[in-house]
Design a protein with these regions (language model features):
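Alpha-solenoid HEAT/Armadillo repeat architecture
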Residues: 18-19, 34-35, 106-109, 123, ...
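Ampipathic, surface-exposed secondary-structure segments
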Residues: 102-129
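Amphipathic alpha-helical scaffolding segments comprising HEAT/armadillo-like alpha-solenoid repeats
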Residues: 4-18, 38-58, 84-104, 127-140, ...
């Protein structure tokens, strides 16, 4: 919990964010501050996302080896939202996380990392401003199940809860069903 983090530790990480010359150290400081609900961290993290290639390879997926850096950023941003909302600033947090989360959705259109936490966030909070981005995401990845199978199903599940007409129309257009994308576990 953020209240358990000593103020001197927060200040030390802020100094790293401002004074370090290394991009890696700045990124890790920004991610940590973001997860603690510190706005300076979120701003710096979003700035680092402006050149995605500089972050690629920071984290690898533990099973499949693809770049998982943006999934890690996603976790920090959703924690940011939770921490700021817990302080009573839900509307402020909602506005502040919109840009980084939509950037993550857009990057995920062409990269294999998972964004299921965004779908959970959107469904749980009923933040419909994300729907155009999620619709576009599904439209772009649905023809590439070899890369995005789990993500396709996750996006379908999300949109079935919030915009089922869109999902059914897209599936009909592609001559597919939800079952065509349901993940199965090989035995």
């Amino acid at each position: 919990d953020p209240e358990d983090i000593p103020l001197n530790r927060i200040e030390a990480v802020k100094e790293l964010l401002l004074d370090t010359v290394g991009d890696d150290e700045r990124f890790f400081a920004a991610k940590l501050l973001t997860s603690w609900g510190i706005h300076e961290g979120l701003v710096a993290l979003e700035r680092s996302m402006e050149s995605p290639e500089s972050l690629e390879g920071t984290y690898s997926h533990r099973l499949h080896g693809y770049d998982d850096t943006y999934c890690q950023i996603l976790m920090a941003v959703t924690r940011y939202f939770a921490n700021v909302a817990d302080r009573g600033d839900t509307d402020l947090a909602r506005a502040q996380v919109f840009s980084p989360l939509t950037k993550i959705i857009e990057l995920s259109n062409s990269k294999p990392f998972e964004i299921g936490k965004i779908f959970d966030f959107v469904v749980n909070e009923k933040y419909l401003e994300y729907l155009p981005y999620i619709r576009n995401h599904l439209s772009l990845i649905i023809d590439h199940p070899d890369i995005h199978r789990w993500k396709i199903y996750d996006a379908i599940e999300c949109l079935l809860k919030l915009d089922s007409k869109f999902v059914m129309s897209l599936l009909k257009e592609k001559n597919k069903t939800v079952e065509d994308f349901r993940p199965s576990v090989a035995r």
